[in-house]
């Protein structure tokens, strides 16, 4: 399994030393009782999908870590052999100024998003949860975070239009209108809300690969 992971993300992005395993198995409040077997750091969505496909073949459990600002035990391993997927290298941001939406990868922090849209004279309704600007957008959606700005605009997920989610099998699922052929994201709540299924799940139902706000 580790050799296969190294072939996907390069060996330098598969961490197995005790210090790394301890660090990535600790959240704001506590350290997990069981350390991650390894920490895997994909650099592209394609790599992330390939990692999850490989884990599915090996039946290897995974947890997903964003900015490490969680205080809910959400990304702490609970059994031996668990792999931690570190989203820190997945930081691409695509801004659509004409239609005023932005698509981000899960490792983008609220600080990075705020700076990117601010450089174009724009801003998001929310700009970071109570755990801080170093928290990631993926983490915010995974925890249904209350953000600075929520008093006026609602929780962070209220601005979420759709996302690309990788299921445990490695299959990619696109939710919202943006998932349709030749379609763009628009208001989320027309029809069944498949997007909402993956909000607040702490990554348990699928790994968020891209989110459009």
Outline where the language-model segments fall:
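N-terminal flexible segment immediately upstream of the FAD-binding catalytic core
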Residues: 1-53, 57, 69-100, 129
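Short N-terminal amphipathic alpha-helices
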Residues: 17, 62-64
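FAD-binding subdomain of flavoenzyme oxidoreductases
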Residues: 92-96, 104-106, 110-213
């Amino acid at each position: 399994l580790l050799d296969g992971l190294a072939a996907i993300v390069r060996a330098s992005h598969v961490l197995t030393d005790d210090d790394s395993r301890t660090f990535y198995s600790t959240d704001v409040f506590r350290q997990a009782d069981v350390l991650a077997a390894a920490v895997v750091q994909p650099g592209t969505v394609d790599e992330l999908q390939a990692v999850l496909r490989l884990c599915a073949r090996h039946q290897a459990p995974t947890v997903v870590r964003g900015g490490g600002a969680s205080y809910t035990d959400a990304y702490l391993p609970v059994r031996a052999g668990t792999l931690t997927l570190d989203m820190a290298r997945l930081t691409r941001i695509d801004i659509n100024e004409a239609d005023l939406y932005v698509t981000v990868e899960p490792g983008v922090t609220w600080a990075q998003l705020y700076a990117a849209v601010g450089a174009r004279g724009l801003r998001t309704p929310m700009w970071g949860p109570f755990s801080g600007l170093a928290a990631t957008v993926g983490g915010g959606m995974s925890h249904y975070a209350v953000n600075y700005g929520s008093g006026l605009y609602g929780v962070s997920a209220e601005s979420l239009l759709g996302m690309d989610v990788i299921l445990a099998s490695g299959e990619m699922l696109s939710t919202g209108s943006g998932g349709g052929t030749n379609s763009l994201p628009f208001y989320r709540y027309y029809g069944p809300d498949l997007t909402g299924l993956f909000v607040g799940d702490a990554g348990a139902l699928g790994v968020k690969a891209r989110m459009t706000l």
